Design a protein with these regions (language model features):
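Transmembrane alpha-helical segments of polytopic membrane transport and secretion proteins
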Residues: 1-47, 277-295
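Short cytoplasmic-facing helical segments at TM-TM junctions of multi-pass membrane proteins
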Residues: 176-222
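Transmembrane alpha-helices
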Residues: 166, 170, 202-236, 263, ...
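Alpha-helical membrane-interface segments at transmembrane helix boundaries
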Residues: 37, 41, 96-108, 131, ...
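Generic hydrophobic transmembrane alpha-helix motif, especially the helices
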Residues: 138-175, 182-183
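C-terminal transmembrane helix and the adjacent membrane-cytosol boundary/short C-terminal tail
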Residues: 185, 220, 262-295
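Transmembrane-helix boundary motif in ABC transporter permease subunits
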Residues: 108-138
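Periplasmic/extracellular loop-to-transmembrane helix junction in inner-membrane transport proteins
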Residues: 29-35, 59-111
Length: 295
């Protein structure tokens, strides 16, 4: 009798173990999908897009001068990143050199924009007198197209790196100011009231309540500043540069090298998305509670 009961217990234990293994497998698959699913969908989406592009280009529906094959674009990109044209060539240097030049100017301009924009936005949000003084200038300059200022900057600064960095800074600074400003202004009153109940001083209110609440707004402003800054890079290099990705686009257009032009445009998209993803990782590091709230 005991032997039969032992057999039943062993069978039940095996069934339980099998069920636990199935649950573990399902959890592991769910965890893998949550972690890598979005990347897999993105890769699949891009693969389909470039395959359709390649087929459409090879069909001859559009002149290759206007729409080269995706393979031609990637070939031009690889060649530009791995080789260097001789100094006497129509397009001297390599994509790598022009990319480094543009990224250097973007980094400097974006850094200056953060140094100016974050304190200015926080100050405008925290002081109504500063807000009244600066807000008309901020809105006026933020709504002004940067391209309209290029002739003025060329007149004052010439065709120099200073002119390009100035345009990049002005393109990136206003989204940062406006977002930091909005972050301070929209801080929940209940949080401030609770902190005051616990005896928080004015400085503690600012650094322990207002600033952490504003961090996501600042990160969003920097993300917008990256996009605007890249636009500033291209504008500055097209109209007043002799080097950089904007200059390279112009020279590729002048020589009807559409493969190179599309390669540079594709590279700009990759750079922009990479920098924005970098800011997301930065936000996850300096504001980990945001990741908890999104779960």
């Amino acid at each position: 009798m005991s032997t039969v009961e032992d057999s039943k217990d062993a069978a039940a234990g095996e069934i339980t173990d099998d069920f636990d293994r199935i649950q573990d497998t399902e959890w592991s698959l769910s965890e893998v999908w949550n972690r890598y699913g979005s990347w897999a969908v993105t890769v699949l989406n891009l693969t389909i897009f470039f395959c359709l592009w390649e087929l459409f280009a090879w069909s001859g529906a559009i002149n290759p001068l206007f729409l080269p094959a995706a393979s031609s674009m990637f070939s031009a990109l690889w060649e530009g990143l791995t080789t260097t044209a001789p100094p006497g060539a129509v397009i001297s240097g390599s994509i790598r050199d022009h990319l480094f030049y543009s990224l250097t100017n973007l980094s400097i301009g974006l850094g200056i924009a953060c140094v100016i924009g974050i304190p200015a936005g926080l100050l405008m949000g925290g002081n109504k007198y500063v807000e009244r003084i600066l807000s008309p200038y901020v809105w006026a300059l933020a709504s002004l197209p940067r391209i309209a200022l290029v002739p003025l900057f060329i007149l004052f600064l010439g065709f120099t790196v200073k002119m390009q960095i100035t345009i990049i800074t002005l393109s990136a600074v206003f989204p940062i100011i406006i977002n930091a400003w909005a972050g301070v202004k929209t801080t929940e009153k209940s949080l401030l009231a609770a902190a005051r109940v616990f005896g928080a001083s004015r400085s503690e209110l600012y650094f322990k309540v207002v600033l952490p609440y504003t961090l996501p707004f600042i990160i969003a402003g920097i993300q917008q500043g990256i996009g605007r800054g890249l636009i500033g890079v291209i504008i500055a290099e097209i109209f007043g540069g002799s080097k950089g990705l904007g200059y390279l686009i112009t020279r590729a257009g002048d020589t009807f090298n559409s493969s190179l032009m599309y390669a540079v445009l594709f590279l700009l998209v990759v750079v922009s998305l990479s920098l924005i993803q970098l800011t997301r990782w930065l936000e996850a590091y300096i504001a980990p509670w945001r990741r908890i709230e999104s779960l």
